[in-house]
Amino acid sequence: MKVKAATFDIGGVLYSDDAFKRAIFSALNQLTKVSAADFDQVYLDHLKQPDGSLRSKLCISFLGSLDKKSELMRLANEKWLFNDDDQYQDGKAALIGLKQLGLKIGIVANQPAASSERLKKDNLFDLIDFLGISALVGFEKPDPAFFKLAIKELDLPADQIIHIGNRIDTDVNPAKSLGMKTVWVRRGEANPNPSKADLEAADITVGDLKNLPELIKAL
């Protein structure tokens, strides 16, 4: 097996993206009045055409500009908490399975600091060799510097690390650009109507993580 480490996104991979949806919807409604139907339409439109930041798009759509984006995200981060039902059991099993195969494990995720506490509660924290949470490291995907930091901290060549995420634009493409291998997980904020190019972008494309350790071992 050529892969020696795996980096995981959190939302859509280990936990449901519904936690972010709940938080940002609540935060928007603290600043203005937004219906669930209008919110869902903007959210879905972005998933189908993921051009730029979803957070910025929501801010512009409902607050008229980016002037209050920092305030919006401050409010959202206070509510951005995973509950027990948000955890993907196949994600947890895949992470544990890859660790048992001898891989180093990293996190590369745009998340608030509180997500590290959730990893501790779910007994995943101690399995992690590099904790890359945006609020803690000061980078956000798709910034290549975030992935470069993971490569440096895992102390392996890029082509021996595989990144697992559910976004082509913020996970697969930036990781590939640095020579990392990639897994595209088609759930959560993944484009529901992928192009042929999307389907061919990653080394592995899956709808769930049930067989991920075996698929990575076979690379």
Regions found by a protein language model. Give the residues of each.
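Asp-based, Mg2+/Mn2+-dependent phosphohydrolase catalytic module
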Residues: M1-K4, K69-S70, K92, I96-K99, ...
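N-terminal helical cap/lid subdomain that shapes the substrate entry/recognition surface
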Residues: K2-L101, A113-E117
